[in-house]
């Protein structure tokens, strides 16, 4: 751990200023991704990559499961399935995913959160800590949350509907006064269609009994870790669904924003 990248200060503004001038950023590590976000938007909901195979490429990440059967969150080599009924359960090694993003998590920026912050404020803090949008950031937050709002897509059946139709019927859950973990990524804007540009985060409670794709949250206290990553490896499927999908629709950015908000 570089001593310049470890902070123990009660003021997030001062911490951000401390790192803002730290410009010689050279993200380490590698992000492994199976399939493309544009494929998921197009309705490619089945993949051949297993959870066991994902863990060969990382110990931290997020994604979904075949047939859109819930959200995926992973940290410390633990992988959980966040179901559409709001529950959470450990994922099985043989389960498969149509889309997932994994990395071996290595934090090079760490700091405590000692004041109440909204999701937007946390994102602004991260943007000041890592001012270049051309790097990937793996983000982990362990904390106490007065509120977290999540959604989880319900399991689908063939013939598959496009993602924008599916999310119209997704259940929304509100967790109050919970300890838990946020795992997510900030991806560069140039990855639109490949990944989710900007912030993409999932949440699970400390009891590992509930969670989902984050729409909003408020954190009271916690610990933020950021790992900067400069390499991306994408493993594209060879299924008929993928090969025949329109992966470059005109509205791809708008579609991703609508599906992932």
Curated annotation (Swiss-Prot):
Any matching Pfam family: AAL_decarboxy
Alphabetical list of NCBIfam families matching this protein: acetolac_decarb
Functional summary from the UniProt entry: Converts acetolactate into acetoin.
Organism: Vibrio cholerae serotype O1 (strain ATCC 39315 / El Tor Inaba N16961)
Top enzyme class: lyase
InterPro entries according to UniProt: Acetolactate_a_deCO2ase
Lyase among keywords: yes
Pathway: Polyol metabolism; (R,R)-butane-2,3-diol biosynthesis; (R,R)-butane-2,3-diol from pyruvate: step 2/3
Protein name per its UniProtKB record: Alpha-acetolactate decarboxylase
Keyword annotations from UniProtKB, A to Z: Acetoin biosynthesis, Decarboxylase, Lyase
Family note: Belongs to the alpha-acetolactate decarboxylase family.
EC assignment: 4.1.1.5
CDD domains in the cross-refs: acetolactate_decarboxylase
Catalytic activity: (2S)-2-acetolactate + H(+) = (R)-acetoin + CO2
GO MF, one annotated term: acetolactate decarboxylase activity
Entry annotated with the keyword Mitochondrion: no
Matches recorded under Gene3D superfamilies: Hypothetical protein, similar to alpha- acetolactate decarboxylase, domain 2
GO biological process: acetoin biosynthetic process
Domain of life: Bacteria
């Amino acid at each position: 751990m570089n001593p310049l990248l470890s902070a123990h200060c009660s003021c997030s503004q001062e911490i951000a200023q401390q790192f803002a001038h730290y410009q010689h950023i050279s993200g380490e590590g590698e992000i492994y991704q199976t399939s493309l976000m544009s494929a998921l938007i197009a309705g490619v909901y089945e993949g051949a990559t297993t959870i066991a195979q994902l863990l060969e490429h990382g110990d931290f990440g997020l994604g979904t499961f075949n047939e859109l059967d819930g959200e995926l969150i992973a940290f410390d080599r633990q992988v959980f399935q966040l179901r559409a009924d709001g529950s959470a359960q450990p994922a099985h090694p043989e389960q498969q995913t149509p889309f997932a993003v994994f990395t071996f998590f290595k934090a090079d920026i760490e700091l405590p959160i000692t004041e109440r912050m909204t999701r937007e404020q946390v994102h602004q803090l991260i943007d000041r800590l890592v001012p270049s949008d051309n790097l990937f950031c793996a983000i982990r937050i362990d904390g106490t949350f007065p509120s977290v709002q999540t959604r989880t897509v319900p399991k689908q059946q063939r013939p598959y509907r496009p993602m924008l139709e599916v999310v119209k019927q997704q259940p929304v859950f509100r967790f109050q006064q919970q300890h838990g973990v946020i795992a997510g990524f900030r991806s560069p804007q140039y990855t639109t269609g490949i990944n989710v540009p900007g912030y993409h985060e999932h949440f699970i409670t400390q009891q590992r009994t509930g969670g989902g794709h984050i729409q909003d949250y408020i954190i009271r206290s916690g610990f933020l870790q950021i790992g900067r990553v400069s390499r991306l490896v994408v493993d594209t499927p060879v299924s008929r669904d993928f090969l025949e999908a329109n992966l470059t629709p005109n509205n791809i950015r708008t579609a991703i924003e609508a599906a992932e908000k």
